[in-house]
């Protein structure tokens, strides 16, 4: 599978959009994490339909809708992928509010290693020498963190191991990123509405924080753009490269946690993150080199 410049840019854009959320959710107080997740689902639906209109994807969405009912196995798979995504959304919203953004970032540091393993074992993808060095650097950093803490956070574990089956299943389903996101949101909508009803009247929260009327729709817009970009990149890139580029997100998460959310970073942890930052630089260099080769060959 060739390297797509568009896929690389989409992956980077998704990472930047996603890492705005840990700080963003603090602006949504006094809503709690469950309320924020439910609102994220509800407000993502109109925003993703606006995205469909803006990108003129109605024919694609209509074709995917027809295929959904023509192939019953797809109809059975979407509730499963929706549940997988809801789990990750819940952790991503809850962790910053619980002061666990650094643990979340460690999970995202582990995720690309899992994705590279998936690419190698299930798709027969080979790593370039620089990619192999990048993975080794990242693995060294992760192992140092385990040695340092003598513990394994469940937040990190669920984040690292939850996404690979999701990406594999979505790739197997062969539904475009935007249509798949629409279907998953529609499957989650009844659950989100039920959660908001069960959690009770929110009028007091909106009176205390009128900004919620603007911030909640914006949450849906950020979610729609970020997830659409991520899924599009996952289909345009080889699984291994897609996994390695995912290191950009935890680096940014780390910076948000330390610089903006005030989470503690001990000097000895530098030996965890320095090899991982080196892995990111090597990956970017290797991706640029491969893209230049393709351009010279006219691919």
Curated annotation (Swiss-Prot):
It is found in: Cell membrane. It comes from the Bacteria. Belongs to the EamA transporter family. Keywords: Cell membrane, Membrane, Transmembrane, Transmembrane helix, Transport. InterPro entries: RarD (IPR004626). This is Chloramphenicol-sensitive protein RarD. The chain crosses the membrane at residues 8-28, 34-54, 74-94, 104-124, 126-146, 147-167, 180-200, 212-232, 241-261, 271-291. It is a multi-pass membrane protein. One of its GO terms (cellular component) is plasma membrane. NCBIfam families: rarD. It comes from Pseudomonas aeruginosa (strain ATCC 15692 / DSM 22644 / CIP 104116 / JCM 14847 / LMG 12228 / 1C / PRS 101 / PAO1).
